Amino acid sequence: MKSRIVILVFGFIAIFMSCTAKNGGGSFWLSDDLDTTTYYYSKINDTTYYLKFEKLCDTKAEGYFFVFSDDVYVNKENFVIESKGKNHIVKYRNNTVKTRIQCFVRENGLVVQYATFGKVLGIFNKLTWSEEINFKKYRKPTFVKYPARYKEKVFDKIEVKHDVVYGSAEGYWDSYPTETETYIEILTKGVLSTVSKKNLDLKMDIYYPVGDSLEKRPFIMFIHGGGFYIGDKKSEAMVEYCKYFAHMGYVTASVNYRLGFKPMGPSVERAGYRALQDIHAAMRFIVKNASVYGIDTDYLFAGGSSAGGVTSLNLAFMRNKNRPESTTKGLLYDDLGNIESSTNSIKAEFSLKAVINMWGAVNDLEILKNSQTSVISFHGDADKIVPIDYDYPFQDMKSQINTLILFKMYGSLPIHIKLKELGRREELHIFENAGHSLNVDEDNHLNENFKFICYKSRDFLYGEIFPESYKIKSIPMTLFHRAMPLYETNCKDYVKMFWDIEGGVIVGMKDNQVRVVWFENAHKHKLKLSILTDTGAGFYDEYEF
């Protein structure tokens, strides 16, 4: 009985080369309808067989078969079918069987019959034909790999809307480009400029890809550094960060904010708070005008260097309850108001998905409890401007003036220790023996660290758009036995999803799950996943063992 079942399975292959046995045709040929690139399968006596042939000639067919089961691995077993006149010789598993077969090729499969030989009156040959057996044609799943938007360059051209006004406020200045002056020289020159304030129109430059049909894109706001005293949205680093991410499909912006402070008391801290108020207003402006600029407000990010890093962190984590005492009304100072009360009157709520912190710091680690925002940081362990640990900024000032006008701050190291304790998604990159402004060289030109920061930030933000759960995982999950019959992705908000396999066969797909069988002796075992999400981005993952 077992031999008959196997004959049933293999016999149809030989018929691809023969005429109909019942009609007595003696010719053999290769059917043009035969698909040599895929499998044919049939369920016989509760067992499913998959067959595929690889070599064909006029009188001979060779291929392999496997039996589908609940086992993780299957063995491919070879077979050979030869035509002998009207009959066929099937060889498999060290068996040789003589039979006669007929087959009708259909678009979606095959209809097969086989015959057994007998004698009439012990003299004449008699053929007894089996019932028809239907073999379905295996349709290999289509596989399309989409461009990895947000991880690779997908747009050649970008455009910039310059000097978009997002608000106005009273301040000293909002732009102070400088390349050669030392910080002390700048502070000295700026003393006269802080005698009185004036109303400032605050602006941003918005970068976006050209030819993008997507209506809602993630947004990154970049904030320049300069100790809340100098800097400009057109600084080379901020411009290049904006361009880099815009080429990958983001909308980005480089923002100017109020700068300047009097070199006394808590003025520096108040300047940092004014910067936060302005940047908060800039983000409210973006949220209100999201449809104008094609921005997805579910994916808002901020990044900055030095003072810009400080402001990015405060934007994500500081709340009005955490306002520095110096920002409230005192004998010498007016109340600066709540975070969202300045610069423009837009009412809009938002939360940041992640922050790119480049050598920034915070005044209080407790503010990190206020948000689930993820953080990636870059910091030199020899930074004397914004120390990586808990210390006073500007340690290169003479006579320890910094201890008189500044407060100690928590650098990237304690920030990430705290984030790890809180279970936040975080990533810290420490540069050994490196000081401040890691992304430029001695001549103030962008260096290799700039590229490193771009690549690592790209991957980190990509992980926010495509969380770890999107990756292929086995069912059940296991760390040691990666070969499983079932796999899935937790991505539910997809437009299209495709699976592919090497070293096995996909035998079933449902929603976000796939069922496979692996060939035990395959040179490579790899499962591939490609997704087009509702964000318009392509996601790709491989599961290999």
PLM feature spans:
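Short amphipathic alpha-helix adjacent to the substrate-entry channel of hydrolases
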Residues: 234-254
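C-terminal catalytic histidine-bearing segment of alpha/beta-hydrolase fold enzymes
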Residues: 409, 413-476
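Primarily recognizes the serine-hydrolase "nucleophile elbow" in alpha/beta-hydrolase
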Residues: 281-371
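Short beta-strand/loop motif that positions the catalytic acidic residue
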Residues: 377-379, 383
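N-terminal glycine/threonine-rich, aromatic-flanked beta-hairpin/loop signature
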Residues: 44-83, 525-527
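N-terminal cap/lid segment of alpha/beta-hydrolase-fold proteins
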Residues: 138-215
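Short beta-strand element of the alpha/beta-hydrolase
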Residues: 215-226
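Surface-exposed, flexible coil segments in extracellular/virion-facing regions
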Residues: 501-515
